Amino acid sequence: MSDSTPKTPRGFVVHTAPVGLADDGRDDFTVLASTAPATVSAVFTRSRFAGPSVVLCREAVADGQARGVVVLARNANVATGLEGEENAREVREAVARALGLPEGEMLIASTGVIGRQYPMESIREHLKTLEWPAGEGGFDRAARAIMTTDTRPKEVRVSVGGATLVGIAKGVGMLEPDMATLLTFFATDARLDPAEQDRLFRRVMDRTFNAVSIDTDTSTSDTAVLFANGLAGEVDAGEFEEALHTAALALVKDIASDGEGAAKLIEVQVTGARDDAQAKRVGKTVVNSPLVKTAVHGCDPNWGRVAMAIGKCSDDTDIDQERVTIRFGEVEVYPPKARGDQADDALRAAVAEHLRGDEVVIGIDLAIADGAFTVYGCDLTEGYVRLNSEYTT
């Protein structure tokens, strides 16, 4: 992976505009497209209430070719019936037509409030004047335009060989992806073998976006896409996978630390599991525990809540509490040792000091085998409750 300052990938253009989805008049409509043919890899939500955007995208990426995506923020267009499906098709078709592309090469993604129709009159008015954007780049504008309750845009750039990879993402709530993420779009001018591109993309997504959880709620609109137009030539697949992992992990940490009302990033490192799947399961159980989340928020060195959360994995009968080790940062808190009152006070003080940081690391060694997985989340605050209790009001 190159250390040079990454630039914009060749051949990608961005258009953003306000079309009435957002109440504050900000840009809420985004088109990201490649001027050259591109291969595409994508993963989507497994929600049984998936929106029409997800359904249309699944169909479009089946042949591994796509040139772009239109993103509508502040309206999920989910649970909107036949009208919502027809509106999604109309928007996608109109964008493709404006750019002179086959409809099947344009994807569509939506995010925001569920159960509301698109404001089609204002969208149609904007689509009448849509054309290819002038000049390459604009990913920073796209990262901002796709936001909903995010407090900041999320963008990352990485150089790999002679190519550039850019990633943007949104999402801070309703976030526990299942083979997808919230909305994440990667664009690269690297040339990749389509089959290998798909394999490495799925591997990276599983280790990054599928490892983050804010509130255990899986979105109906989760979509992650990688476009590769090849204008920079071939790159080593292994190097590209490393670059993609670096970019995706940076976005994951940014999402987790920007969780609705969040003040702290929580990283749970599970080792010594029977396999990686067990490690992931234990890590998710810990990072999703409201008691663990609130303890982290309050800097309360109540490490027993982590032990409680591990114990909830009752189907994992090979977990033996006498073999488990728990630590906060570098401070080992379990198994218990005969320390004396002063030593116990010092231990709690050391844990509390670690919890006062912006990033909290909880380490768990199950001492069963060599399975390992790291998951990411955030603390639970009054801000989360306030924001979600007033979301549509």
Curated annotation (Swiss-Prot):
Gene Ontology MF annotations: glutamate N-acetyltransferase activity; L-glutamate N-acetyltransferase activity
CC annotations in GO: cytoplasm
Catalysed reactions listed for this entry: N(2)-acetyl-L-ornithine + L-glutamate = N-acetyl-L-glutamate + L-ornithine
pH dependence, record text: Optimum pH is between 7.5-8.
InterPro entries: Arg_biosynth_ArgJ (IPR002813), ArgJ-like_dom_sf (IPR016117), ArgJ_beta_C (IPR042195)
Enzyme Commission number, as recorded: 2.3.1.35
UniProt site (Involved in the stabilization of negative charge on the oxyanion by the formation of the oxyanion hole): T111, G112
Keywords: Acyltransferase, Autocatalytic cleavage, Cytoplasm, Transferase
CDD domains on file: OAT
Amino acids binding substrate: T148, T149, K170, G171, V172, G173, T181, E260, N388, T393
Assembly with partners or alone: Heterotetramer of two alpha and two beta chains.
Note: The role of this protein is probably directed towards producing increased intracellular concentrations of arginine for clavam biosynthesis, rather than primary metabolism.
Name recorded for this polypeptide: Glutamate N-acetyltransferase Oat2
Organism of provenance: Streptomyces clavuligerus
